[in-house]
A protein has these predicted regions:
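Beta-rich catalytic cores
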Residues: 42, 62, 97-101, 106, ...
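Beta-propeller domains
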Residues: 185-186, 191, 211-312, 317-328, ...
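Short glycine/acidic-enriched loop and turn motifs that connect beta-strands
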Residues: 51-58, 124-129, 189, 239-244, ...
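Hydrophobic strand positions within the blades of repeat-based beta-sheet folds
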Residues: 46-48, 66-69, 84, 101, ...
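Blade-edge motifs of beta-propeller repeat domains
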Residues: 2-31, 70-100, 138-164, 194-216, ...
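Acidic/hydrophobic-patterned starts of short beta strands in beta-sheet-rich repeat architectures
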Residues: 40-49, 112-122, 176-185, 228-237, ...
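A detector of repeated loop/turn-to-beta-strand junctions in beta-rich toroidal repeat architectures
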Residues: 60-66, 78, 117, 131-135, ...
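Beta-propeller blade termini
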Residues: 30-44, 49, 102-115, 166-174, ...
Length: 454
């Protein structure tokens, strides 16, 4: 079994051009209701990257890009799209062959003007003599959509060669002051940039979550509300070296007025690859789902850390041998390669989508698929879980790696989270229903090659 390169993170659509025009926000503007509503129309928009390739064709370019499909009352509006790259008007930098613009993407209304902004990481960007230093670009939302950009300055410790600044991003109001903040991985450490942000490049205070002194190296982030205090909490995936031995760990950081404070941590036998936060038992506390696809010779598991008022405590483990879960345990399936939480059927309980991108089906190697677990009063259950096969995106084939990334978000405001699934060179948007996400009326997102918004 092989692992899809496209899945290592987190269109043949007509792309509208970007303009460098900045629209002034009204003085009374508040933070956008949805962190991914770039034009302020009340509907969530979908952004996805193809960071290791450019637009197809002889006159194309390389260096990575992010595509945006704007939302509407009927779902994604494929006639209203946009593409952002470093050669777009108003976007800093220049697209270069080994750039990974879109390696990570996140969003929030960073300048509090009522429009969500797109944050794009490019961890391989060369800056001056600093090779692979990396950059983070904020592309500003407006009434007409995304327009113009500002580069975020890294601090010492994430500004040298091989820092890969921007390799992972996460947003949230971590100190509860009403201004969205931004967490960035650079130099194998996590940096917290406090809001508000301005188009001239200023931010609030910047602090380092310094665990390198304890042998900790960060490689993944997930943000959400765990302990019910209203502040956003942060989950960091990484490796800690103890007595020169690596240990795979997940670290929960509690949101606080001072920023982020130390919380619980958990050690795993294999590397944590993905994480999502959702209230699977509807008790008011967010549960942390961690995907560990390499566990047990690549059969994979998902570990769910239960949320409480004091943070995560106790856990349950799920795999393809769990009661009611479709499929069977097979080496190399990579169950848990991607995870995302959302209420797909509108019952008030968060559900969990789990990508199984290297699942073999009927002799087709690495065909892939997605399992959707149902939330309930007792938390996640395999009972009533559903399997979404690769054939919803196209004919059965090998090496499609369907499920390499997954994302659950309600884009049409019907109270049910819609499912977007990535594969090798393609992605599919499916509507949530009272039973399970459906391929009826689905939307293809070709030119995909990277990840989705968190």
């Amino acid at each position: 079994m092989r692992r899809s390169t496209a899945a290592a993170l987190t269109v043949t659509l007509v792309a509208t051009g970007l303009t460098p025009l900045f629209l002034a926000a009204p003085a009374s503007a508040a933070v956008a209701k949805h962190y991914d509503d770039f034009n302020g129309d009340g509907y969530r928009d979908l952004a996805y990257s193809h960071y290791y390739s450019g637009i197809s064709g002889d006159d194309g370019w390389t260096g990575g890009a992010v595509n945006i499909v704007y939302g509407s009352a009927s779902g994604l509006d494929t006639t209203h799209t946009q593409v952002v790259h470093q050669d777009s008007p108003g976007i800093p930098g220049t697209g270069e062959e080994d750039d990974y613009f879109g390696e990570s993407i996140s969003s929030a209304d960073l300048n509090k003007d009522g429009y969500a902004d797109l944050i794009v990481g490019n961890g391989t960007e060369h800056v001056g003599s600093a090779q692979y230093r990396g950059t983070v670009t904020i592309v500003w939302g407006s009434r007409t959509g995304l327009s113009g950009g500002t580069t975020l300055a890294p601090k010492s410790g994430a500004s040298g060669s091989q820092s890969h600044f921007g390799s992972e991003l996460a947003t949230g109001d971590f100190n509860g002051d009403g201004s969205p903040d931004l967490a960035v991985i650079g130099g194998s450490e996590t940096w917290l940039y406090r809001g508000p942000f301005t188009k001239s490049g200023t931010t609030g205070g910047v602090s380092k979550i310094d665990k390198v002194g304890q042998g900790w190296y960060s490689h993944g982030l997930a943000a959400g509300k765990v302990n019910g205090d209203g502040k956003t909490d942060l989950v960091v995936l990484g490796t800690q070296f103890v007595d020169n031995r690596p240990a795979s760990r997940v670290w929960y950081l509690k949101g606080a007025s001072s920023g982020l404070t130390s919380g619980a941590s958990k050690t795993y036998a294999s590397e944590p690859w993905s994480a999502a936060i959702g209230d699977f038992d509807k008790n008011g506390y967010g549960d942390i789902a961690v995907g560990l696809p390499d566990n047990n010779d690549g059969r994979g598991i998902v570990s769910v850390w239960h949320g409480t008022s004091s943070g995560p405590s106790g856990s349950m483990t799920y795999n393809q041998a769990s009661s009611g879960v479709p499929g069977s345990l097979e080496a190399g399936d990579n169950f848990g390669y991607s995870v995302s939480a959302g209420d797909t059927n509108g019952d008030g309980y968060a559900d969990l989508a789990v990508g199984v991108p290297q699942e073999d089906v009927a002799g087709k190697e690495d065909q892939g698929g997605v399992t959707v677990f149902r939330g309930g009063s007792g938390g996640l259950t395999g009972t009533r879980s559903t399997w979404i096969p690769q054939t919803v995106i196209g004919p059965a084939d090998s090496y499609v790696s369907f499920g390499s990334p997954v994302r659950l978000r309600d884009l049409d405001r019907d109270g049910r989270a819609d499912l977007t699934v990535g594969a090798n060179g393609d992605a599919l948007f499916m509507r949530g229903t009272s039973t399970t996400p459906t391929a009826t009326g689905s939307v293809h997102l070709p030119e995909y090659g990277g990840g989705f918004l968190d």
